[in-house]
């Protein structure tokens, strides 16, 4: 009888917890205004004023009709009619216009989950549209079908890349799409970089390079796929509703 009541209360607690989590997910995030931290791209005004000051109708050193050091008709050290340290008539750190802002915009907060994911996946390469550079690999031993190409590869393999460029696996529908994109961007970047140094590649070089990079891209996909699968499983089993459900099932089995 006692176990039956305990099982009922645990079931009710599970339903309440699950509902609360669902409601939390549906609640809209509060919108952020200027300097509230809600904007992903905060304002770019400099703390000392506008980088390009407005051009009013006053003479040299007399913006907006005021005297020397008197912008907008205020007294000495009183911009826009406010007191000392009060731009635009506001208090200290309460600028009222698009220029002359005193308080710095708050920096956007970076989620630790995103930082950890980026560190685990690889370093993002600037200027390549979100591509990441994988860790160094050993160049695979490949047989090309004839002695000449096999010997040529062994003698020139050091000239081919040992790292690949790639995007997260969740942006592709299958392995083939990932590998195709990975090979294209890696061969292109390596060819351009090497050509600027005065070294050119022959058709044989490009053919062998594509084969080598293809094998490395397949290896990179397998690594990223396994890592992504592991992170997804850990997130699922660490959520409170799942933990409560597992505990309830264990209680029913043991009881």
UniProtKB/Swiss-Prot annotation:
Q: Would you list which residues are glycosylated?
A: 184, 200
Q: Does the entry feature the keyword Metal-binding, yes or no?
A: yes
User: What processes does the entry annotate via GO biological process terms?
Assistant: cellular response to amyloid-beta; cellular response to copper ion; cellular response to xenobiotic stimulus; intracellular signal transduction; learning or memory; negative regulation of activated T cell proliferation; negative regulation of amyloid-beta formation; negative regulation of apoptotic process
Record's compositionally biased regions (Gly residues): 55-99
Identify the species of origin.
Camelus dromedarius
Q: Please give one Pfam family short name.
A: Prion
Name of the protein in its database record: Major prion protein
What is known about what this protein does? Its primary physiological function is unclear. Has cytoprotective activity against internal or environmental stresses. May play a role in neuronal development and synaptic plasticity. May be required for neuronal myelin sheath maintenance. May play a role in iron uptake and iron homeostasis. Soluble oligomers are toxic to cultured neuroblastoma cells and induce apoptosis (in vitro). Association with GPC1 (via its heparan sulfate chains) targets PRNP to lipid rafts. Also provides Cu(2+) or Zn(2+) for the ascorbate-mediated GPC1 deaminase degradation of its heparan sulfate side chains.
> Related disease?
PrP is found in high quantity in the brain of humans and animals infected with the degenerative neurological diseases kuru, Creutzfeldt-Jakob disease (CJD), Gerstmann-Straussler syndrome (GSS), scrapie, bovine spongiform encephalopathy (BSE), transmissible mink encephalopathy (TME), etc.
- Residues bound to Cu(2+) 1: 64-66
Keywords, A to Z?
Amyloid, Cell membrane, Copper, Disulfide bond, Glycoprotein, Golgi apparatus, GPI-anchor, Lipoprotein, Membrane, Metal-binding, Prion, Repeat, Signal, Zinc
What does the record say about its membrane topology?
Lipid-anchor; GPI-anchor
Annotated compartments = Cell membrane; Golgi apparatus
């Amino acid at each position: 009888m006692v176990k039956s009541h305990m099982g009922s209360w645990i079931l009710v607690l599970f339903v309440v917890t699950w509902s609360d989590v669902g409601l939390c997910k549906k609640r809209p995030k509060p919108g952020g205004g200027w300097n509230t931290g809600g904007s992903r791209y905060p304002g770019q005004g400099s703390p000392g004023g506008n980088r390009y000051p407005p051009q009013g109708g006053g003479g040299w050193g007399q913006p907006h009709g005021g005297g020397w050091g008197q912008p907008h008709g205020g007294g000495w050290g009183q911009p826009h009619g406010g007191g000392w340290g009060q731009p635009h008539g506001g208090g200290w750190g309460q600028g009222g216009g698009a220029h002359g802002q005193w308080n710095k915009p708050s920096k956007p907060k970076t989620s630790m989950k995103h930082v950890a994911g980026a560190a685990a996946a690889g370093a993002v390469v600037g200027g390549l549209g979100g591509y990441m550079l994988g860790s160094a690999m050993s160049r695979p031993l490949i047989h090309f079908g004839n002695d000449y190409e096999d010997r040529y590869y062994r003698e020139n393999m050091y000239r081919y890349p040992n790292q690949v460029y790639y995007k997260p696996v969740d942006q592709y529908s299958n392995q083939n799409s990932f590998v195709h994109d990975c090979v294209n961007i890696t061969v292109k970047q390596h060819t351009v970089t090497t050509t600027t140094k005065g070294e050119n590649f022959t058709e044989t070089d490009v053919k062998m390079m594509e084969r080598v990079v293809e094998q490395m891209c397949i290896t990179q996909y397998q690594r990223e796929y396994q890592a992504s699968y592991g992170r997804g499983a850990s997130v699922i089993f660490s959520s409170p509703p799942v933990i409560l459900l597992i505990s309830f099932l264990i209680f029913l089995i043991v009881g």
